[in-house]
């Protein structure tokens, strides 16, 4: 009986640990207050700064699954802890 109980506790613990998702700031402006629960597999937060000749700089923050190469006039940083892209 103790073995069965221990097995159930271990399975429950593994289920809870594997179900935790990253949280990241998610917005399209300089002031970023929204926190997003990332989808499964998205273990990175990013901050993308886009330089535009007309409007200056635009900042986008959110969740990502992989690190992508920045485009022209972009600077992208990635991090792997909760809300690290603030």
UniProtKB/Swiss-Prot annotation:
Q: Name one GO molecular function term.
A: toxin activity
Q: In which tissues is it expressed?
A: Expressed by the venom gland.
UniProt protein name: Toxin 3FTx-Dis4
Q: List the disulfide bonds.
A: 24-45, 38-63, 79-84
Q: List the record's Gene Ontology CC terms alphabetically.
A: extracellular region
The cross-references to Pfam families, in alphabetical order and at most eight, read: Toxin_cobra-type (PF21947)
> Signal peptide: which range, if any?
1-19
Report the family membership: Belongs to the three-finger toxin family. Ancestral subfamily.
